Amino acid sequence: MKIFLKMTVVSLLLLITVSCTEKQAGNSLPRSTPEAEGVSSQAILTFLDAAAANTDTEFQSFMFIRHGKVIAEGWWDPFAPELKHTLYSTSKSFTSTAIGLAISENKISLDDKLISFFPEQLPDTISENLSNVKIRDMLSMSVGQRRESPATGTEWVKDFLSVPVEYEPGTTYRYSSLASYMLSAIVQKVTGEKVIDYLTPRLFVPLGIEGADWETSPEGINTGGWGLRLKTEDLAKFGLLYLRNGKWNGKQILSENWVKEATSFKIHQNPNLTEAQRDSVNDSMQGYCYQFWRARNNSYMANGAYGQFVLIMPEKDAIVVFTAESNDMWGELDMVWKYLYPGIMDEPLPADENKSAELKRRLASLSLPVPPKNSNEAISSLISGKTITLAENQRQIQSMSLKFNDDLCSLSLKTDENEYSLTFAAGKWQLGETNMRGPNLFTRSANNQIGLPPFKIAGAYTWNEDRSLELTLRYIDCMHHQKYIFRFDDNNTALVDIIDSNSLRLRAPSIEGTIQ
């Protein structure tokens, strides 16, 4: 009897383990090899060579999907598959999806007027153009405003409605992240839920997307035009849902009509260009849809600042996903057309074991450069544990302290309101977390990131030949990083430079410090 009970318990445990494993595997896309899905491994290797040589784009993750299967994927260390990533304007396509779902539930229509949703926030005088703005105009970035509301206060909806609508709605393209915010506000108004909460049972759960978060405005509304964080494979699933016309695992979770409507051409970014001129520029001039962009080769995409892309190629039944920090995001897409696209064939290719093995090795060993492991015992022993009191500065940092222990350097920062501790390793990335907000494209984001910390970070340090200490802090659930550069002299003084990777041209002046 005891043996029987023991075997029963073991069997149940095995069943539970298998069930959990199957459930976990069920949340992932199927994997295959490039050649089995009609793609050349050599084409992907050539792309990786070009990515390594590209000085304008720091690739952070990459995923290539063909016929619904992942055929290549890679993360440049310290980025990793399990990490979420700030998407910037790729978020807009998810806001568009929420609008599509709300339309299918008869909560709104494309022709609903903007002013009908916010009667209490309207300006005293409502112009004819403002009164005619429809949801479809906000989706296609053709509200008619010449300038965008700064939204630096606490009433973003009211601020947006106060900006004059100078052009007839639907006639003039003007990119506006605040128009996307207003779409988010509309969804929340008609559903009683934030966009992220509205999407969770309708989109995220069916696709097996877990752990999503989204920045929120001071009004308690998801920012809509930016601020969503998802993993790389989550983006691939989203792209595949659209590639499959809204169907997932045999179930229509998004209207096929909406997919076609949302991804078809609506307005030219520059109507004065000829077709030949548009093709000769880059993918930025192929036309705008409903919070999606048209792209070359009859493709379309969700994209975000600094090179966050979900490129959907229906004619090739393929998707390419990038997360990156790029100063040439359109050049990033050019690499797809130059290296990856020509390698996509109509039929499966013969297996190429050598190239396949080389590709697996390359993808598994991707890494961003780590600062070299250099030391300076003389200076580090003199400053370790001492406080550097800083002069008044834009970052409101009062003091810093450095401590060295073996191959680790700890940096403590004291601001007007908080204290933070960061750890950096020599010759490798030291992983950690912090509540300190990092670089962000939007100045208004200081108000948006409440509730998102702790942020995932990786730190490394080195001593340079000029005897300066350089600390590199990567925010690995974002694309940006910071550098802290310390220069010490013999008079117990220091100069500190703090450089944000997304604002190199706006570099702040050095901060003077006294070592005590």
Annotated model-derived regions:
Residues 68, 85-111, 138, 183-187, ...:
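Active-site SXXK
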Residues 18-19:
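C-terminal motif of bacterial Sec signal peptides marking the signal peptidase cleavage site
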